[in-house]
């Protein structure tokens, strides 16, 4: 079993999943993973399915050189976006695996949130392409490692309201003025 970059805060309420040496572009997968970070599991799965169907785009923020603009990126408050289909499918597969791990652990699947997702570069695979005049150029691929930690979200308890409203705290000057007014009125 490999090490994760981060361990969950509460191991009993979390589940993990990882994939190594995946033949999918690192840069596209990095952007797609950043888009679904801290999303609820069901929303992340729906988002990735929409990316495959080109109904929602993945915003490209870091690796955005030469990336075209699209109107769907406006909901992310950016202009550049793409639909990395293969990356979305790999992430969906990983989330499905993490979901089955959570189900096995007895966690409530509908309350799971993507607490941690990280994409790292894997060693490049080398191929070759043949050029004019007998030359050979490299034809590299950029695979990646992906790790996901899902955590069951705790229910937020509403703060109890006090019956009597708290009085505003006054500064020393204002307190002094109030005392002077009281003295004058007497």
Swiss-Prot record:
What the entry lists under InterPro entries is as follows: Ribosomal_uL22, Ribosomal_uL22_CS, Ribosomal_uL22_euk/arc, Ribosomal_uL22_sf
Q: Where is the composition biased (Basic and acidic residues)?
A: 177-186
Quote any Pfam family the record assigns: Ribosomal_L22
Segments for region (Disordered): 159-186
Q: Name one GO cellular component term.
A: cytosolic large ribosomal subunit
What keywords would UniProt list here? Ribonucleoprotein, Ribosomal protein
Q: From its record, what is one biological process in GO terms?
A: cytoplasmic translation
Entry keyword Ribonucleoprotein: yes
Q: Which GO terms describe its molecular function?
A: structural constituent of ribosome
Family of this protein: Belongs to the universal ribosomal protein uL22 family.
Q: Which NCBIfam families match?
A: PRK04223.1 (NF003260), uL22_arch_euk (TIGR01038)
Protein name (Swiss-Prot/TrEMBL): Large ribosomal subunit protein uL22
Name the source organism. Phlebotomus papatasi (Sandfly)
Q: Which gene encodes it?
A: RpL17
């Amino acid at each position: 079993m490999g090490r994760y970059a981060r361990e969950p805060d509460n191991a009993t309420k979390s589940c993990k999943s990882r994939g190594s040496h995946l033949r999918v572009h690192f840069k596209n997968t990095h952007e797609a993973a950043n888009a679904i970070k801290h999303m609820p599991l069901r929303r992340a799965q729906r988002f990735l399915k929409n990316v495959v169907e080109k109904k929602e785009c993945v915003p490209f923020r870091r690796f955005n050189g030469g990336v075209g603009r699209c109107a769907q990126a406006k909901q992310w408050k950016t202009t550049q976006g793409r639909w990395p289909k293969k990356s979305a499918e790999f992430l969906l597969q990983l989330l499905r695996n993490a979901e089955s791990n959570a189900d096995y652990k007895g966690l409530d699947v509908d309350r799971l949130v993507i607490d941690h997702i990280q994409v790292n570069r894997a060693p490049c695979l080398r191929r070759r392409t043949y050029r004019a005049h007998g030359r050979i150029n490299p034809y590299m691929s950029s695979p990646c490692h992906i790790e996901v930690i899902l955590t069951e979200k705790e229910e937020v308890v509403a703060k109890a309201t006090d019956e009597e409203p708290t009085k505003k705290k006054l500064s020393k000057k204002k307190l002094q003025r109030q005392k002077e007014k009281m003295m004058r009125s007497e």
